[in-house]
């Protein structure tokens, strides 16, 4: 059984043509991208690394990591977002290899091939997040690192990520997120450890609606990212 939610894919297929419009529904992704790439780069030094971006969508993170000197492969199951990613790299001149394939299928094909694997804002959109985490473990080289980001599951996250972002501030289309699919840090940590990954660090991402700025800090109540290591 494929670990793909067709309804989730359809949501992003419908919006794909606006992926690189910085004033569109993807504005938050564009704004948080530099913060996240810096955090990752500080921990792994992307230059010269072979990197896999799981759930790459239209390529915002993939291109940013390639610009830091990484050799990047981006995978996604959305045909339209991948088409947008491929068109955008023709425009930007940034080289990324894009493929329409699941993490699980690529893990069969390319075990232990990547220095770094990123899987950001993707786990909350698949039926079985732990399956993706296991696939990421299989694809990263021993001694390599895997980064995940998702949204915590608690009343504050519901109020800010769904009610606030989708209904009040209208930063995202209604229905972008399903609260039941949000993932607590304890759950993500347990799935990572079960897969063989050691959790090294965790950071929160917060948004100030008054200043309209994001920042990384210790508050993991809503958005957060973890760094994990596959030991040698």
UniProtKB/Swiss-Prot annotation:
Cite the Gene3D superfamilies for this sequence. Answer: Vaccinia Virus protein VP39
Q: What is this protein called?
A: Ubiquinone biosynthesis O-methyltransferase
InterPro entries listed in its UniProt record: SAM-dependent_MTases_sf, UbiG_MeTrfase
* Catalytic reaction annotation: a 3-demethylubiquinol + S-adenosyl-L-methionine = a ubiquinol + S-adenosyl-L-homocysteine + H(+); a 3-(all-trans-polyprenyl)benzene-1,2-diol + S-adenosyl-L-methionine = a 2-methoxy-6-(all-trans-polyprenyl)phenol + S-adenosyl-L-homocysteine + H(+)
The keyword Glycoprotein appears for this protein: no
Task: Sum up the protein's function in the record's words.
Answer: O-methyltransferase that catalyzes the 2 O-methylation steps in the ubiquinone biosynthetic pathway.
Where, in this chain's numbering, is S-adenosyl-L-methionine bound? 36, 55, 76, 120
The UniProt entry, under Pfam families, shows: Methyltransf_23
Q: What does the record give as its pathway? A: Cofactor biosynthesis; ubiquinone biosynthesis
Instruction: Write down the CDD domains for this protein, in alphabetical order.
Output: AdoMet_MTases
Q: What species was this sequence derived from?
A: Pseudomonas putida (strain ATCC 47054 / DSM 6125 / CFBP 8728 / NCIMB 11950 / KT2440)
């Amino acid at each position: 059984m494929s670990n793909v939610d067709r309804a989730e894919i359809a949501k992003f297929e419908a919006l794909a043509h606006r992926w690189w419009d910085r004033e569109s529904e993807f504005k938050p992704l564009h704004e948080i991208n530099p913060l996240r790439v810096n955090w990752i780069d500080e921990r792994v030094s992307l230059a010269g690394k072979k990197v896999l971006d799981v759930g790459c969508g239209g390529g915002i993170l993939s291109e940013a990591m390639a610009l830091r000197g990484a050799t990047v492969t981006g995978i996604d199951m959305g045909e339209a977002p991948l088409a947008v990613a491929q068109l955008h790299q023709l425009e930007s001149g940034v080289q990324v290899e894009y493929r329409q394939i699941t993490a699980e299928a690529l893990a069969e094909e390319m075990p232990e091939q990547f220095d770094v694997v990123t899987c950001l804002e993707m786990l909350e959109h698949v039926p079985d997040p732990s399956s993706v985490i296991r696939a990421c473990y299989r694809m990263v080289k021993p001694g390599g690192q895997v980064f995940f980001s998702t949204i915590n599951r608690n009343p504050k996250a519901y109020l800010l990520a769904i009610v606030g972002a989708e209904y009040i501030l209208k930063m995202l289309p209604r229905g972008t997120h399903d609260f039941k699919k949000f993932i607590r840090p304890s759950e993500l940590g347990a799935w990572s450890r079960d897969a063989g990954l050691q959790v090294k660090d965790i950071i929160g991402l917060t948004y100030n609606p008054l200043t309209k700025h994001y920042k990384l800090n210790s508050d993991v109540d809503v958005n957060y990212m973890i760094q994990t290591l596959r030991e040698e």
